[in-house]
Every structure is written in structure tokens, then in C-alpha cells.
Amino acid sequence: KFINLLKRKQITETQRDASIDPFGVNKVGVPSMGGVIIIFAILIPCLLLGKLSNIYMILMLITTIWLGSLGFADDYIKIFKKDKEGLHGKFKIIGQVGLGLIVGLTLYLSPQVVIRENIEIEKPDGQIEVVHAAKEIKATQTTIPFFKSNNFDYADLVGFMGEHAQTAGWILFVIITIFVVTAVSNGANLNDGMDGMAAGNSAIIGLTLGILAYVSSHIEYAGYLNIMYIPGSEELVIFICAFIGALIGFLWYNAYPAQVFMGDTGSLTIGGIIAVYTRNC
């Protein structure tokens, strides 16, 4: 029904990039802006099942709405204003940088965003046991999966600043967050060239990130796998399940031969979601 509505309103593809999709000439007239249904398929389950006071859930919902609106504006200008360039690039960048700044500062300032560090303890027999610290702390650390002694601290990169290294580490964290949000959301936008490409790839990425979020939200699993325990991050699992479900449902109609395209409404949103998700877990 939604696809038929897009057809009736003539919300369709006008031109595809032949360098990305050599079959694009045959897709003129295929409905676009299908990303709208992806956004609603994410938001509705999260609003019904998620804990809306959880800072991680709040950030993911803000990301979905923020970049969804940015992508919608881009598609609207392309389709209804007949301007193939869409929203001017500088406005896209401003929107993405603004979101990255909000996410980075929120993770820095929110008292809900804490971790429990991994601590290595040497046993009497000489073996090393990894345990979690008793107290939760604010830190600029992150875990690099599948590596021994895998805690990476942004503050280490600015250790030359002495007693100000921790604050400088957070500033660096915010800057990198802005870069990641901007780069990944634009990367997903470029990836949306062939039938099913963006939706399929993003669903696989979402599954991987969901597993990492699930493990890091359980203190026993996190300890066993030697990654940081992040209290409250279990809400990210609820969000990513909605994300994957929305993409798989959309993929049914977006796989070759595509009956609908997500447009920038979808591609900017899913790229931003992946970027912000990686900064949360």
C-alpha cells in the first residue's frame, strides 16, 4: 500500500548514477523515499518497548529523527522541487556535524554514561585473571574486540598534557564522534546505489553491533569475553532489533528487481544510526 501511495503521488526515481548502478536507466519511475517506512518501523517498536529514560535509547531515537528529517528534506527538494542536487551539501554537513556534537557532548556530560574497567589480577600460580572494577566510572575508554589487553583510552593520545589529559581525551572523543557520524552517514548514502545493497549490508552490520551491545550489557558475559561492562546499554539491543527488522522487511521490496528505493531519507538515517551506535557500545 505504501509503495502504491508513492506511485500515485509520483514520488519516484528520476535518475540513477550509472557509474554505481549500470541498470539505473531501467529504474526511472521506481518509487523513492521508502526510508520513511524504515524510520517508522524503527521508531514505533522502540517507543512501545524501549525504556525512554535511558540515555542510549534517547540518543538513538534523536539520531533516527534528526537524520531522517535531513534526508527527507534532501529527497523532497530532488523530487518535488525538481532539483537533482537536492539539499545543498553544506547544510547536510552542518546537520551531521551538529548531531555528532550533540552525541559526543551527551556521552561526556550524562551521568548515565559510565563503564566498569577491566582489571588484570595476577593469581598466586602466576595466571592472569581479568575482572571488572567494583565501581562505575566516567572514562574515555573503549574496547577493541578480539585483542588481548584491548582497552583503548583516548586520553593516552594526549598524555603529554599531564593532569589535563583526561579532559583533552574527552574533547578528542567528541571530535572523533563528529567525524564518525559525518563519514559513516555519507558513506551509507553513497552505498545506496544498487538494489538491496545499503539495506542488506546495514542489516549485517546491525547484527554484529547488536551482539557486541548484548555482551557488553551483561557483566558476566563481558567479563568472560574481556570487554568493558556498560551499564544500561541493554536498551541498545532493543533498538538494534527494531533496526534489523525494519531493514529486512524493507529488503524484501528493495532486492532485485527493486520495487522501492529508500532514498536519502533512508540511507542517511541508517548510516547515522550505525555511526552513533558504535559510539555508544
Show the residue positions of the predicted features.
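Divalent metal-coordination and catalytic microenvironments
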Residues: 34, 75, 264
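Membrane-interfacial loop-to-helix junctions in multi-pass inner-membrane proteins
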Residues: 53-61, 80-95
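Short juxtamembrane and helix-loop transition motifs at transmembrane-helix boundaries
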Residues: 18-27, 82, 158-166, 223-231, ...
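Individual transmembrane alpha-helix segments
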Residues: 148-179, 185
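Extracytosolic (periplasmic/ER-lumenal) interhelical loops and adjacent juxtamembrane/interface segments
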Residues: 125-163
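Select subsegments of transmembrane alpha-helices in polytopic membrane proteins
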Residues: 27-39, 91-97
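Alpha-helical transmembrane segments
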Residues: 1-5, 9-10, 38-69, 101-124, ...
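Cytosolic, membrane-interface loops and tails of multi-pass inner-membrane proteins
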Residues: 2-26, 76-85, 135-147
